[in-house]
Design a protein with these regions (language model features):
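Short conserved micro-motifs on helix faces and helix-strand junctions that flank
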Residues: 8, 45-46, 104, 111
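Beta-rich nucleic-acid/ligand-interaction surfaces
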Residues: 44-45, 164
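N-terminal glycine-rich flavin-associated loop
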Residues: 1-43, 51, 55-88, 93, ...
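C-terminal substrate-binding/cap subdomain adjacent to the FAD-binding core in PCMH-type
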Residues: 52, 71-182
Length: 182
């Protein structure tokens, strides 16, 4: 990935993309969730699946959704016609922005074959803070207080206790607030 732009086939595994980006000290800003640990299964997610569902992870609050990082794509319409939308550079302002429309369409508008996405430099350091909360209201209040503070969290999530336990977090509170500082 050069110039913080990556072009891949839609069926490319997320694990493969993340490994390549890690070598270049880059990352996917929207941080798609890897649910394989929670589901006790092998990670099989693809970048096409992430974009078709617009699945954005805990960094969405600060970085934006997956659709905000799709620069362009090649696809096949329902009539079997190949078409392209967007571009391979950030300064592409011609025509309609079909990229945002395609994200979250679950493949109903076209079959995407290739995507070009914007990447970001990986932070030099990262620290996750965990807070136990006994109810959802206090968990939401904790996140609101942190985002209202002078600190700039990179990601935030609220995990129910059963999900936290499945992820290997040993805390007894009903909800676990996870805040990442970068």
């Amino acid at each position: 990935p050069e110039e913080l732009v990556l072009t891949v086939r839609a069926g490319t595994a997320l694990a493969e993309i993340e490994a390549e980006l890690a070598q270049a000290n880059q990352m996917l800003a929207f941080e798609p969730a890897d649910l394989s640990g929670l589901l006790a299964s092998k990670s099989t997610g693809t970048i096409g699946g992430v974009l078709a569902t617009n699945m954005s992870g805990p960094r969405r609050l600060t970085a934006g959704a997956a659709r905000d990082f799709l620069l362009g794509f090649d696809a096949v319409s329902g009539r079997g016609e190949r078409f392209k939308s967007g571009g391979r550079v950030m300064k592409n302002v011609t025509g309609y922005d079909l990229s945002k429309l395609m994200c979250g369409s679950y493949g109903t508008l076209a079959v995407v074959d290739e995507v070009t996405i914007k990447t970001l430099p990986r932070p030099e350091t990262s620290l996750s803070l965990l807070f136990g909360c006994n109810d959802m209201g206090s968990a939401v209040a904790k996140i609101a207080a942190i985002f209202a503070s002078p600190h700039e969290p990179g990601a935030a999530a609220i995990l129910p206790q059963n999900v936290a336990v499945a992820a290997g977090i040993d805390m007894t509170a009903a909800f676990i607030v996870v805040i990442r500082l970068e």
